[in-house]
């Protein structure tokens, strides 16, 4: 792969015009063979790997020839052979071909995405969930409306192939891709008869399709948004009681005047801001209601024009931050006016002004969380804890670990909110539900369970909580404001409760538009 990248850097035209001969390079299939064995070795016995999974390059080349045929004689996604040995060998060669196809397509895509990102000076972003929180603190208070959009995850295979043709000139190299996509579309497992680009299965091929599809959507959308918002306004800004992130420092510009030691700090404030996590992008807009309606209409037309997709109106929702709450990612978000005293000195302290700034206020969605806990049988609809009967067959350690994992996930995820009083109600529900589950298992009472376990209930998460507050209210942090937020860095993904709540909200919006 390093050799392919070096060739692409020297001559990108060669990469775009001569990709097809790479399919007949034996080194490519050796790489895909090793990668497939590394992935599957954890789930299959070693004796199967040594006896039946020997790679034959002659068989691979014959397999490539079968892919080019119109009758689709090779089955890549569904194995219908009743013989388990032949079924495993067919799956082995099919996965090798898919790995090789992905490797070939990744070479020009990685080079193109690298140079496209380097050329976008003002669209650089951190590719992590941790960058969402400083983005919300910086950009949302300077906006008055947001667009909550969802990326369409179903697309026709021919449209997907045509998007590849925009940056790959080697048409023969796309024939195997077209055959693979159509075969997946016509497979019995795919009932929608379309390509689902969301990677529901963790394979390299589907992950590549999703990354390419999102990159293609955003690259075209960013170029159009830049043209529409070419006039940028400069407003004075300050960051009181905020951590200096690298992203924030980059947005500061210093204008120096001749024969003067003074400097004016100004904040670049574009009118349109974009953030995405998963398949849910959010566009924050500062402008009149007409501008918001135009942006919403443009997003709907954009998908129809470039990807020939009919988007339902509920997939692009607009609302004002001052009147409604938004959700991203799994939070209720609102913007409130918070009077903060900021001293502004100008021209040798001749003028002092007090500025009023907007502040983002993440709210813990207590009522939806209680509703989801009731759905999962941790409590009733009113929030009264009940025993989790389906877990009574587990061991005591497994029950404690599962409850502890749920609480630790919720506490870490919502620790950046100002108002965390509702979290202690959730902790009470989970702790009492855990005690009732153990009491139901041992046919005892809650008092006996608490007396026997004592501090063992949520021991791991409570220790994390104590470390969190000891760090926050230490002697060094005592001088800081008690309303300073600390975002935990333990977040690796959105918690399942937030995903479930988001699905419920989507169904409500869909039913509202259907009426």
Swiss-Prot record:
<dbReference type="GO" id="GO:0008033">
    <property type="term" value="P:tRNA processing"/>
</dbReference>
<dbReference type="GO" id="GO:0008380">
    <property type="term" value="P:RNA splicing"/>
</dbReference>
<keyword id="KW-0694">RNA-binding</keyword>
<dbReference type="GO" id="GO:0003723">
    <property type="term" value="F:RNA binding"/>
</dbReference>
<dbReference type="InterPro" id="IPR024937">
    <property type="entry name" value="Domain_X"/>
</dbReference>
<comment type="similarity">
    <text>Belongs to the intron maturase 2 family. MatK subfamily.</text>
</comment>
<keyword id="KW-0819">tRNA processing</keyword>
<dbReference type="GO" id="GO:0006397">
    <property type="term" value="P:mRNA processing"/>
</dbReference>
<dbReference type="InterPro" id="IPR024942">
    <property type="entry name" value="Maturase_MatK_N"/>
</dbReference>
<dbReference type="Pfam" id="PF01824">
    <property type="entry name" value="MatK_N"/>
</dbReference>
<dbReference type="GO" id="GO:0009507">
    <property type="term" value="C:chloroplast"/>
</dbReference>
<comment type="function">
    <text>Usually encoded in the trnK tRNA gene intron. Probably assists in splicing its own and other chloroplast group II introns.</text>
</comment>
<protein>
    <recommendedName>
        <fullName>Maturase K</fullName>
    </recommendedName>
</protein>
<dbReference type="Pfam" id="PF01348">
    <property type="entry name" value="Intron_maturas2"/>
</dbReference>
<keyword id="KW-0934">Plastid</keyword>
<keyword id="KW-0507">mRNA processing</keyword>
<keyword id="KW-0150">Chloroplast</keyword>
<dbReference type="InterPro" id="IPR002866">
    <property type="entry name" value="Maturase_MatK"/>
</dbReference>
């Amino acid at each position: 792969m390093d050799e392919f990248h070096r060739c692409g850097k020297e001559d990108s035209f060669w990469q775009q015009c001569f990709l097809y001969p790479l399919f007949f390079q034996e080194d490519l299939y050796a790489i895909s063979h090793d990668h497939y064995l590394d992935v599957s070795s954890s789930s299959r016995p070693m004796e199967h790997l040594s006896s039946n999974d020997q790679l034959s390059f002659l068989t691979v080349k014959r397999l490539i020839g079968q892919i080019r045929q119109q009758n689709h004689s090779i089955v890549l996604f569904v194995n219908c052979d009743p013989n388990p040995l032949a079924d495993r060998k067919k799956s082995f060669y099919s996965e090798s071909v898919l790995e090789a196809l992905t490797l070939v397509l990744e070479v020009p895509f990685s080079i193109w995405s690298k140079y496209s990102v380097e050329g976008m000076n003002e669209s650089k972003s951190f590719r992590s969930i941790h960058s969402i929180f400083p983005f919300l603190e910086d950009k949302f208070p300077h906006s008055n409306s947001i667009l909550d959009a969802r990326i369409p995850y179903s697309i026709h295979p021919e449209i997907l192939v045509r998007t590849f043709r925009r940056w790959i000139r080697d048409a023969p190299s796309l024939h195997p891709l077209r055959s693979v996509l159509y075969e997946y579309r016509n497979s019995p497992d795919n009932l929608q008869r379309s390509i689902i680009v969301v990677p529901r299965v963790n394979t390299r091929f589907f992950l590549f399709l999703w990354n390419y599809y999102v990159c293609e959507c955003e690259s075209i959308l960013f170029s159009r948004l830049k043209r529409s918002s070419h006039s940028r306004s400069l407003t004075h800004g300050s960051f009181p009681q905020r951590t200096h992130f690298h992203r924030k420092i980059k947005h500061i510009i210093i204008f120096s005047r001749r024969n003067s030691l003074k400097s004016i700090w100004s904040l670049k404030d574009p009118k349109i801001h974009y953030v995405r996590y998963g398949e849910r992008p959010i566009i924050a807009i500062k402008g009149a209601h007409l501008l918001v309606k135009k942006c919403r209409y443009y997003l709907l037309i954009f998908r129809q024009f470039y990807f020939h997709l009919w988007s339902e109106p509920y997939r692009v929702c607009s609302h004002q931050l001052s009147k409604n709450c938004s959700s991203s990612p799994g939070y209720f978000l609102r913007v409130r006016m918070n009077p903060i005293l900021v001293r502004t000195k100008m021209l040798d302290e001749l003028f002092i002004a007090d500025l009023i700034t907007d502040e983002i206020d993440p709210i813990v969605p207590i009522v939806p969380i209680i509703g989801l806990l009731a759905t999962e049988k941790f409590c009733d609809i009113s929030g009264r804890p009940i025993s989790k009967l389906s877990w009574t067959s587990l061991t005591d350690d497994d029950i404690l670990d599962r409850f502890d994992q749920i609480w630790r996930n919720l506490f870490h995820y919502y620790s950046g909110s100002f108002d965390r009083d509702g979290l202690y109600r959730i902790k009470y529900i989970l702790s009492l539900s855990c005690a009732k589950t153990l009491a139901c298992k041992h046919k005892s009472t809650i008092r006996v369970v608490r007396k026997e376990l004592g501090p063992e209930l949520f021991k791991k998460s409570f220790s994390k909580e104590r470390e969190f507050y000891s760090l926050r209210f230490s002697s060094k942090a005592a001088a800081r404001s008690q309303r300073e937020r600390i975002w935990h860095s333990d977040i690796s993904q959105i918690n399942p409760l937030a995903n479930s709540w988001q699905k419920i909200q989507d169904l409500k919006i869909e039913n509202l538009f259907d009426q």
